[in-house]
Amino acid sequence: MITLFGSVIETLGDPEEFAKTQPVLFNSTAIVYLTMPKGAPMWSVYDLGAFSMSLMLAASEKDIDSIPAYELIKYPEVLRENLPIPEDEDIIAGIALGYASDAKINEFRSSRMDVDDILKIIK
């Protein structure tokens, strides 16, 4: 976390900039909320993750930017008060969709591990 926060500071120069985008839900045009039936097998989360990635890739194909974020589902009781989410569904993920502005925060790119450090293919 410290490394990530350090990278944000290097990109933005001001850590407050990053924090400002979250309460306004990243100024997104739309938000997709993904739910799962309560009591669903935990492996269903893998399916939901794959669906999430497919959704974001499809959006990207249409030049629509996306960001999955905890901030979008941080207050599930507020979501339930304002959206028709059944009580027998758990709110699992939120994905903001829209068009990125030229704000400095949108220049931030987190570092990634080298694929050889996380993947081993055995033939």
Residue ranges and their predicted role:
Residues 1-123:
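Acidic, surface-exposed loops and disordered segments
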